[in-house]
Design a protein with these regions (language model features):
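Binding-cleft/active-site segments that stabilize strongly anionic ligands or cofactors
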Residues: 1-3, 27, 32-154, 168-169
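Flexible loop/hinge segments that line or gate small-molecule binding clefts
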Residues: 1-15
Length: 170
């Protein structure tokens, strides 16, 4: 998760003899995360696919065919939550489960995050009649930002938060 990323930066800095510089980097990343939390306080409920607290129901599509997403073991669940969303697959066992199209249809996401890569440029066909597709709530985030738990996760967090709640980032 994000806290572990920041701890790892500091630990590596200590090991490599650059503890002060590493701490400054980790501190700056933590400040960016804290700024997102401040902006996302008091989310307005503005759509039918939002929870009562304003969080958006999100499906993260890692691969279009076969359809892979994030499950309970993925660090990306925390990222979606910190960005003002709730992963509709957070309770599925495994970190990156393959799911059926029937399961995907039943999830009813309000937004779809695509891990942007050449084989994952659009939502799986199972979502063609979903609210997310009909309302154009399909967002691409560079796969390099999402695929590794490192400093770039903060960039991904900022992008996802802006996509899910553009009204808060004017």
């Amino acid at each position: 998760d994000l806290a572990q990323v920041f701890r790892s930066i500091r630990t590596l800095g200590d090991i490599l003899g650059t503890g002060d510089a590493a701490s400054r980097v980790a501190d700056q990343l933590e400040l960016r995360v804290a700024a997102i939390k401040v902006v996302l306080r008091d989310l307005p409920k503005s759509g039918p696919m939002q929870l009562d607290d304003g969080r958006v129901r999100v499906f993260v599509q890692i691969s279009r065919e076969p359809l892979f997403t994030i499950g309970s073991g993925s660090f990306l669940n925390q990222l979606v939550t910190a960005a003002g969303g709730i992963s509709v697959t957070a309770d599925i066992p495994s970190a990156f489960p393959k799911i059926s199209k029937e399961t995907a249809v039943a999830l009813r996401p309000g937004a779809i995050i695509l891990s942007d890569s050449p084989d994952n440029l659009e939502p799986n066909d199972a979502f063609k009649n979903s609210y997310a597709v009909k309302e154009g709530r399909i967002y691409k985030v560079n796969a390099d930002l999402l695929s590794r738990p490192g400093p770039r996760l903060v960039d991904a967090l900022e992008q996802i938060a802006r996509h899910l709640h553009p009204e808060k980032f004017k």
